[in-house]
Amino acid sequence: MEHLFALVKDGKIKVSYDSESFLGFYELAGLEKPKEHITKRNRGTLTIRNDGVGVGKLFIYRENRVLSPNHTTVGHIVNGMELIDIAKEGEFVTVKSEQERLMLLNKTQAEVKNILSEAGVEHIIDGLEDDDAVIVEQTPKHTIDILKEGKVTTKAIKKEDLCTIKFVDNAPRSVRYFKLLSGLLENPVGQIKIHFAVPGMHIVIFEGDKKAAKGLIPENNPVDKVIRGQIGITNMASKSVGLIGVRFEDNVEFGPTAENFESTNIIGDITSDYDHLEKLKEGVVVYVAESNNESWVR
């Protein structure tokens, strides 16, 4: 169910594909999900592909289809089936769920207290208790588990410690890789772990995933120089494909992951104050969120 919630943005969901028998929503394709609730795929049923080609894709059925163990049922259309019948690829469908998502990440502690109070859920705070602190972790992660247990534990950090990033539009594969690796595809706050950091080097490199980075073609390579605060990813032109990095000073030779420009894909700019990142050590987790603001400094 959380997978479905993650697809809905501002109460709407974008159609990726339409056919006579179903609508497809493919934004989270590639995210592996467990086999859970398997039922007949009757008209109005919502399923998520849990195995094989197209894993992670959401389907809403216009016609009855046979039961498949590769599809997990996550819901059923109650009202508005006529909108599903006429929706076309590229259009948006307004969605209202009987149960709203209890997603607390990237909200302040004060906001979360009110949300959980209204939901009748006990709030357990782990660590920082300031009202203006930003929630970066919640346990359980999923709405259905929070409601079942009647309580949730949250971890917060100071607002200035949250690393916000404005992503570019001309490196779609690389941006998606970063969001997949960090968890930003499904959640408003993600995590990346420091792989390499040496004082005085003015660079921090984060862990990657070679398997997920397979096929990461060159896109949005630097031209004349890399600017401080830019986030870069090593592409498939290098053996270190998938590594993520940031530089704290401009460089005319090497990218944010210490690779040449041909092996570097720039995915965005850090828009928050990032000087403290240079002081962090290997193994430290950095919390990240997407931003629409411009970089705070150049």
Regions found by a protein language model. Give the residues of each.
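Cyclophilin-like peptidyl-prolyl cis-trans isomerases
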Residues: 1-298
